[in-house]
Regions:
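Solvent-exposed, well-ordered loop and adjacent helix/strand elements within mature globular domains
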Residues: 1-127
Length: 127
């Protein structure tokens, strides 16, 4: 696949991690996939009906691999937009922030998500 340099909107963004209850579906109606599904802001803050800022199915490729606690391979650089998060854009994240699904809520997955924490200055490309 041919990759180009990231657009300015995807430079120096925030990345976080989340877990969800068993059986939870994403904003787009799919079941999230551990360490693959990404949630993004809505197009219009406070209006989930506006859709996701990055369209459903957008592939996110981080310029540098991210260390994902609990992930078998340790590092990963590709994620898929399937969910919406921070609907009111009230958490102070960058405009093109994304949130990586770390699995079903539980002591180990919650711990891994918390350990991942908030990553700043993450640049990525989308396809």
């Amino acid at each position: 696949m041919h990759r180009t340099y990231p657009l300015p909107s995807t430079l120096k963004q925030n990345v976080t991690a989340y877990t969800a209850k068993s059986g939870s579906k994403t904003y787009h109606g799919t079941y999230p996939t551990k360490y693959r599904t990404a949630a993004v802001h809505p197009k219009t803050c406070g209006k989930p009906s506006s859709g996701t800022k990055l369209k459903y199915g957008t592939q996110i490729y981080t310029v540098n691999e991210l260390y994902l606690p609990g992930f078998a391979n340790g590092y990963k650089d590709d994620f898929l937009v399937e969910d919406m998060g921070d609907v009111n854009c009230s958490k102070g994240f960058s405009p093109y922030w994304f949130d990586i699904y770390f699995g079903v809520k539980g002591s180990s997955t919650d711990k891994n998500a918390k350990t991942f924490g908030l990553k700043k200055n993450v640049s990525y490309e989308t396809y």
